[in-house]
């Protein structure tokens, strides 16, 4: 089955055909680095990491670009509040972002352009838009894109100019020609960073940054552009307008958007203050559990964040690892099975990870039934393609976050003491040790080979 991707612009699934045979250019809007990443950011990271993994499994040579917004009103404000330099603030949170995504087994993008490193490209694009009468300098030193000069504006969101006009606020004494116009260049203010330009010192607007970076890294016309659903309008709509008016070429073939992570029916966001950072959640749940939770819903659907749903994810990942616990996955080549074709068909159907995971559970059931190392190897291989089952079962079960103060050595010592108690027929002490460990979230598993343990 050929790969099909739901294109936000056409509102339908389309068979994916790359612009250049066997090559894919993918650009994703990344994080504005003024705070720690939250679970909403994690979803975008994990979803597009999974998209890239699948494209590569199909044999495509993928160039994955995910930008970093390192200059922005929020960044400036946070740096002032913290009494630290913008460079210090953004460097700190870029490092934190990389730590978080590494924990979630998210592979680093091939390119990670920062807005502040692309000022020449931004200036060139703005100059081109002014020359072509799609943009104009205002009397206050700002530069604006003139929305009504672009006859095609609104095609991604399905909004037409009349609708936008009726919903726009009348601005008194505005320097804009029209309330719909958006900023490309902001004139500098006191105590704000600024770059020189033909229109005076200032800094770029958010939308133009992505147009300049994406076209510089991938060319004027590339295959896939992704991001969160909240970016489809106005950010991505404005990107299309700027890019196509500047270059005269079609900008992007396929637009992909992730649904929101929600808490109590509200989008998780820093501005609403209802967010959980990735590192907060990592204190409670194993990274693979968080990754599984984010992939258990189709990427276009909303995800409801709750401990109950994360607990379900924890149990589900545990079931998959349990299938590998007694059947070695590293001692055989992956077996042939129709389930592999079913897994690939699910992923080729607009990256349907819930259906692909259902196939993994079917495969786990067969591993448990047949005790086949070949099927275990296949389970691990397919799960790895979506970034799961990367550890050994023993390592997974022993590395769950826990409130217990017991070290591995202390647990092993208690297991030895329990074995001696059982040998001496002191079953009271044996049960006491088992219960003691269970109370600390440690489960003992007795078998013919001896006693093993796991965190629960």
From Swiss-Prot:
It is found in: Cytoplasm. The keyword Nucleotide-binding applies. It catalyses: tRNA(Cys) + L-cysteine + ATP = L-cysteinyl-tRNA(Cys) + AMP + diphosphate. GO terms for biological process: cysteinyl-tRNA aminoacylation. Its EC number is 6.1.1.16. Binds 1 zinc ion per subunit. Signal peptide: none annotated. Monomer. This is Cysteine--tRNA ligase. It comes from Hydrogenovibrio crunogenus (strain DSM 25203 / XCL-2).
């Amino acid at each position: 089955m050929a790969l099909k991707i739901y294109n936000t612009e056409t509102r339908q699934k389309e068979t994916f055909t790359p612009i250049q045979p066997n090559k894919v250019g993918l650009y994703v809007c990344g994080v504005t680095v003024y705070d720690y990443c939250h679970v909403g950011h994690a979803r975008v990271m994990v979803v597009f990491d999974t998209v890239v993994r699948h494209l590569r499994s199909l044999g495509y040579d993928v160039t994955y670009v995910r930008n970093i917004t390192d200059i922005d009103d929020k960044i400036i404000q946070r740096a002032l509040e913290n009494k630290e330099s913008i460079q210090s603030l953004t460097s700190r949170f870029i490092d934190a972002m990389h730590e978080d995504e590494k924990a979630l087994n998210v592979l680093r993008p091939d390119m990670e352009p920062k807005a502040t490193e692309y000022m020449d490209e931004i200036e060139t694009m703005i100059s081109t838009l002014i020359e072509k009468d799609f943009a104009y300098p205002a009397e206050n030193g700002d530069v604006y894109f003139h929305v009504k000069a672009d006859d095609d504006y609104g095609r991604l969101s399905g909004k037409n100019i009349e609708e936008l006009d009726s919903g726009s606020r009348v601005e008194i004494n505005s320097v804009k020609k029209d309330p719909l116009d958006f900023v490309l260049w902001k004139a500098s203010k006191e105590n704000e960073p600024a770059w020189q330009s033909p229109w005076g010192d200032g800094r770029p607007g958010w939308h133009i940054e992505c147009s300049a970076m994406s076209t510089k890294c991938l060319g004027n016309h590339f295959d896939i552009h992704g991001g969160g659903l909240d970016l489809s309008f106005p950010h991505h709509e404005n990107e299309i307008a700027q890019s196509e008016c500047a270059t005269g070429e079609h900008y992007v073939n396929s637009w992909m958007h992730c649904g929101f992570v929600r808490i109590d029916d509200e989008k998780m966001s820093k501005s609403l203050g209802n967010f959980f950072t990735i590192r907060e959640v990592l204190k409670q749940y194993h990274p693979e559990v968080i990754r599984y939770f984010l992939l258990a819903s189709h990427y276009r659907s909303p995800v409801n964040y709750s401990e109950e749903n994360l607990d379900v994810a924890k149990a589900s990942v545990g079931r998959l690892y349990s299938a590998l616990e007694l059947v070695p996955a590293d001692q055989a080549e992956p077996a042939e099975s129709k389930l592999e074709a079913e897994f690939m068909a699910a992923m080729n159907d607009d990256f349907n990870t819930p259906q692909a995971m259902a196939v993994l559970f079917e495969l786990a059931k067969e591993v448990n039934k047949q005790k086949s190392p070949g099927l275990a190897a296949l389970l691990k291989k397919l799960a790895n393609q979506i970034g799961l089952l990367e550890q050994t079962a023993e390592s997974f079960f022993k590395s769950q976050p826990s409130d217990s103060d017991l070290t591995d050595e202390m647990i092993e010592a208690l297991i030895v003491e329990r074995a001696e108690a059982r040998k001496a027929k002191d079953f009271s002490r044996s049960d006491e040790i088992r219960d003691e460990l269970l109370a600390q979230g440690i489960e003992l598993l007795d078998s013919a080979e001896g006693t093993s343990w796991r965190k629960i």
